[in-house]
Amino acid sequence: MPEIKLTHVTKRWGKFYAVDDLSLDMEDNSFITLLGPSGCGKTTTLRMIAGLETPTSGQIKIGDRVVFDSEAGINVPANKRKVGFLFQNYALWPNMTVYQNISFGLGNIKEELPVIDEEAKALKSMIKALENPGELVKLIEECRDKKGKLDLDMVYLKLIDNYTISIYTAKELYNYKLHEAADKESAAKQKKQELTAKLDSILAGHKEKREELNEKFEVVSGGKVVTRVRKYSKEEIDLAVRRVSRIVKIGMFMNRYPAELSGGQQQRVAIARTLAPEPQVLFMDEPLSNLDAKLRLEMRYELQRLHVETGSTFVYVTHDQMEAMTLATKICLINNGVLQQYEAPLTVYSRPNNLFVADFVGNPSINFIEAKGVQNENGSLDVTILDGRKAKFVPKEHLDLQRWFAERDKNEADEAARHKEKMQDKKAVEKSNKDE
């Protein structure tokens, strides 16, 4: 999965800066949380990376591809960035079933794709299933109700999940009625021979055209996979829907409507729909905010599992520091559009960059005590606090206050000089929402 790189990205409306000169490197296969108070610019940052918001200036790269560059005039549309976006309200179509919600976006994709021999692929799957007729019959028989009647929806679901096949292949496999045969072994053997002969005929046809099929049943000619601009077939769409439904465990809800699902189930459907096109990056904008406390905790574990299983890069917006601390490999803490700290959760917690970070992260909040004093030669500090009380502070690590003050003053002077130089540009706009 790709790395995401933001370079001097700014978004402003008039004199109001939603995001101010943000530079970030998000490593591949990372779980990044954008954390901060309401209105700090985290959702705007997410939307700019996804292509739903146009930055005022800067550059954004996803992998090796520049998707936005203000100077070069590049702005790749959102639907061409190969990213998935999970909205806060899930955005499920109420008039569509779960299956239709997940498959809807797949039907609109048209791009250069490998040519796949789907018939050969389905035949190979059925031949493999028929190699163990006892297991196949057992799967079907397990789907009988108390009256002995087969639940066909359950039969198809078991066949789909057990053999990783589409609904169309599952129906064809069931229609062989192997479970009704007197001699199941002989019936399976005969059907397997028929399917093998058919598969051999297809492979021979490819050979005549000087083609072959690879392990994914893609057509290979001259050592290269044959591609063409096309849409996904019904078989491919169904396989994709079934794949993501297994990941988020919603296979049994395919025929239900969103109104018939709980909040957690609706979220799983939204996640499945986002994962179906196999996006390079997955963006989530406070997806747990509508759930109750217990369900939020459960879904955090689900998101961690998904991150490990999919290997995707996750970028997650939240103002809940507990979510950020438990989910993230790195926390990007923003305030008033300005990056405050970008490090691992424990580093942000134990070594805050400034007073804002120290105050924002942690529950209960940290206590700030104003103190005046001097530093001794051994590094300890004699201080006066709380209306004249004397105290001695011994730092855990070596602390040179004089050096710290000198560096602070230098950084402030450098920042003031950079700002002055920036404001000399005729295109520069003074920030109305001043930093604290």
Regions found by a protein language model. Give the residues of each.
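Internal alpha/beta loop-helix hairpins
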Residues: 308, 313, 318-426
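The feature captures the beta-strand-to-loop junction immediately N-terminal to the Walker
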Residues: 35-37
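Helix-to-loop junction immediately C-terminal to a conserved catalytic motif
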Residues: 50
